[in-house]
């Protein structure tokens, strides 16, 4: 349900030893490929619970979304459940309320923080090598130009800061001390950093930056999606804002 998961419309109604699910989900990774789906739905008392729905269950329909300019190597699907009956034992026993799905998001956001570093490094390395070998104006490498060096320095500085942030949060996580707002900061900062790095790297390569001989446009297109999924950039700013002020500003 976008940035308002608490407003989800999918419902699960108890029927004897079974639950009946009705609703739709969009933008589900590998939804049409998965043998088992984890579906979050509101029960009759309005509490969000998690359910395991197996592929082939009557009433479950999955379809793929096409025409994407981003995440083209990933299968993205929609799911629809129409009077979809599953055994009551398929409920996740310890997942109750928003804590369940948001806990999953927190884990994913941590991984994305590192993924942003990897994408940024690929773009930086490409731009650096290109700048050192591409020559112009009396056969000089464009890396000798002040403005090109400025872009390269910006990239490696921001990447290094992102690496340190990811390492710090990772160490806190290993000790069980990582706060969800710190993980929001990691995801927010490192995806922004990676997207800006991709844009600057594309600029260094000029027209060559848009062709598939180089990885930059692929990373840039994918990062446009990562900027939004697992919590939008702006939502993460609000999460951090509430943490430091104690005042929620979502509405």
Locate each region found by the language model.
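A gly/ser-rich beta-alpha-beta helix-loop segment of oxidoreductase catalytic cores
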Residues: 1-14
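Short Gly/Pro-enriched turn/cap motifs at secondary-structure boundaries
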Residues: 1-3, 27-30, 42, 68-75
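Short, solvent-exposed loop/turn segments at the edges of secondary structure
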Residues: 5-7, 33-34, 46, 74-76, ...
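Short beta-strand-to-turn element immediately C-terminal to the catalytic PLP-Schiff-base lysine
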Residues: 13, 39-42, 52-54, 80-82, ...
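Alpha-helical interface subdomain recognition
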Residues: 14-19, 80, 104-251
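A short core secondary-structure module
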Residues: 18, 22-63
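Flexible, small-/acidic-enriched active-site or ligand-binding loops
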Residues: 56-85
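A short, charged helix-loop
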Residues: 77-103
């Amino acid at each position: 349900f976008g940035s308002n998961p608490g407003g989800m419309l999918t419902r699960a109604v108890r029927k004897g030893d079974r639950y009946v699910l009705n609703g739709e989900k969009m933008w589900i990774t590998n939804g049409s490929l998965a043998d088992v789906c984890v579906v979050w739905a509101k029960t009759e008392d309005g509490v969000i619970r998690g359910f395991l729905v197996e592929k082939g269950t009557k009433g479950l329909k999955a379809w793929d979304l096409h025409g994407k300019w981003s995440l083209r190597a990933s299968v993205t699907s929609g799911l629809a459940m129409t009077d979809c009956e599953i055994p009551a034992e398929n409920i996740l026993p310890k997942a109750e309320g928003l804590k369940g799905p948001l806990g999953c998001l927190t884990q994913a956001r941590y991984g994305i923080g590192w993924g942003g570093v990897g994408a940024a490094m690929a773009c930086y390395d490409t731009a650096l090598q290109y700048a050192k070998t591409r020559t112009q104006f009396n056969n000089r490498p464009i890396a000798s130009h002040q403005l090109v060096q400025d872009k390269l320095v910006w990239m490696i500085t921001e990447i290094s800061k992102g690496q340190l942030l990811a390492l710090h949060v990772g160490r806190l996580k290993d000790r069980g001390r990582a706060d969800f707002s710190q993980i929001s900061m990691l995801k927010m900062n490192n995806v922004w950093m990676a997207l800006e790095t991709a844009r600057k790297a594309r600029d260094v390569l000029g027209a060559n930056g848009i062709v598939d001989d180089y990885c930059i446009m692929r990373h840039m297109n994918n990062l446009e999606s990562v900027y939004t999924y697992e919590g939008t950039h702006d939502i993460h700013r609000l999460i951090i804002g509430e943490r430091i002020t104690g005042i929620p500003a979502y509405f």
